[in-house]
């Protein structure tokens, strides 16, 4: 039976659901920490690769490869920065199972989604930071 007062209801809810809430908060913090760690690694790599200069003296093959890789990475950054993370999660977790018959665990999917989303934002931050340095 719920108590009548607001404070009594809060205490009742904390007694009933407090342990579950704390467990969920811990899992969320773990997921955020691991996903952000992997996302930072992805972001640093993508951001650095996006700033590789193409010199006039480079071979044609090298120029083409660098431009194609930069284009793919720019598409990755724009797509994952431009769509909501929840839509990405739904598509990756449910869409991969439906379209490609890939059944991944919910933990792998969660870490993967947070990592690639964070990586896209971090890549743009790293790229912008590198390009803001005066060539002097």
Task: Enumerate the predicted regions with their spans.
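Transmembrane alpha-helices and adjacent helix-loop boundaries
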Residues: 1-135
């Amino acid at each position: 039976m719920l108590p009548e007062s607001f404070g009594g209801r809060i205490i009742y809810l904390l007694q009933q659901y407090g342990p579950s809430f704390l467990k969920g908060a811990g899992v969320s913090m773990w997921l955020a920490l691991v996903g952000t760690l992997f996302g930072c690694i992805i972001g640093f790599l993508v951001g650095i690769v996006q700033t590789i200069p193409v010199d006039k003296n480079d071979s044609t093959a090298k120029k083409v490869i660098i431009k194609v890789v930069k284009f793919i990475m720019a598409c990755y950054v724009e797509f994952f920065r431009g769509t909501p993370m929840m839509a990405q999660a739904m598509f990756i977790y449910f869409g991969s199972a439906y379209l490609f018959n890939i059944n991944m665990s919910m933990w792998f999917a969660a870490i993967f989604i947070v990592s690639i989303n964070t990586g896209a934002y971090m890549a743009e931050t790293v790229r912008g930071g590198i390009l803001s340095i005066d060539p002097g």
